[in-house]
Amino acid sequence: MTNQSLHVNIDKWIAENETSFLPPVCNKLMFFYQLNIMYVGGPNVRKDYHIEEGEELFYQVRGDMVLKVIENGKHKDVHIREGEMFLLPARIPHSPQRQANTVGLVIERRRLSKETDGLRYFVANSTEVLFERWFYCENLGTQLVPIIKEFMDSKENETGKPDPANPIKPAPYPLNTMNVMTPFSFREWVEKQKPVLASGCPVDMFGEQFETETLLFGSGTSANKRRTDGWIWQLEGLSNVFMNGKEYSLTAGDCLLIFGETEYKWQRSQDCVALYVAQDPDRKRPY
């Protein structure tokens, strides 16, 4: 399917690609398939808010960030500190604010053909919509640039007020009304789960109410075939994945992408701790 290596050492990849974290979005895709795995740098201070029908998983590798959101009609700053993880629910306007010398992981999925993304600007110090555009998102990193430029050149940006000649149209779907979670220390959470892992059971981080499946695995062997892509992040110990006639040996700090509809066998050592992430749109919550 691809000549790209599916087995990557994360720290080495970040070091090799950090110069590619360019404004205004500052992201570099590690994998761009059904599952999009990207790392994001800074500085990147933005005024636009992104809206999408899927979820986004955040983890801060280095330094802190602020994710500005609109929660139930009010502005809120979500501080995601180094080493913390956060799952953003679908359909919540959000605007990442990142400083220089920071690196964060963001995971999202390919959009379904019927899904629409939005880019929205607000009147200063309010939640009144100033300017927005809705579009089918194929590559956010490239598609945001012309929309941001259109806004910067617009009458709305010049005056700070909506343009009566271009009235805001109804959004294609309602915004999410749930409250966002509090970011948490990923490593502390992992340590607390080790007694459960020792019993041979994986731990579901977020539960079935989200379409993002984030499972922590300990030692053992499993065989599977999923409809969607899956991403393994080896945290501790060793594991071996067998698929398509190849063996992939993972050590701490490695990751591996498994394409959807691929049969694979996963053998995990006694001291293995690994995270498995998938995003299945069939698990989407109804509006």
Curated annotation (Swiss-Prot):
GO cellular component: cytoplasm; cytosol
Region (Linker): 164-180
Annotated binding of Fe cation, by residue: H50, E56, H94
Matches recorded under InterPro entries: 3hydroanth_dOase (IPR010329), 3hydroanth_dOase_met (IPR016700), RmlC-like_jellyroll (IPR014710), RmlC_Cupin_sf (IPR011051)
Reactions the enzyme catalyzes: 3-hydroxyanthranilate + O2 = (2Z,4Z)-2-amino-3-carboxymuconate 6-semialdehyde
Positions contributing to O2 binding: R46
Pfam family, one: 3-HAO
Region annotated Domain B, chain positions: 181-287
The protein's annotated pathway: Cofactor biosynthesis; NAD(+) biosynthesis; quinolinate from L-kynurenine: step 3/3
EC number of the protein: 1.13.11.6
Cofactors (names): Fe(2+)
Keywords associated with the record: Cytoplasm, Dioxygenase, Iron, Metal-binding, Oxidoreductase, Pyridine nucleotide biosynthesis
Region (Domain A (catalytic)): 1-163
GO molecular function: 3-hydroxyanthranilate 3,4-dioxygenase activity; ferrous iron binding
Localization of this protein: Cytoplasm, Cytosol
Binding residues for substrate: E56, R98, E108
Function noted in UniProt: Catalyzes the oxidative ring opening of 3-hydroxyanthranilate to 2-amino-3-carboxymuconate semialdehyde, which spontaneously cyclizes to quinolinate.
Subunit organization: Monomer.
Protein's name according to its UniProt entry: 3-hydroxyanthranilate 3,4-dioxygenase
Organism, scientific name: Danio rerio (Zebrafish)
Primary gene name: haao
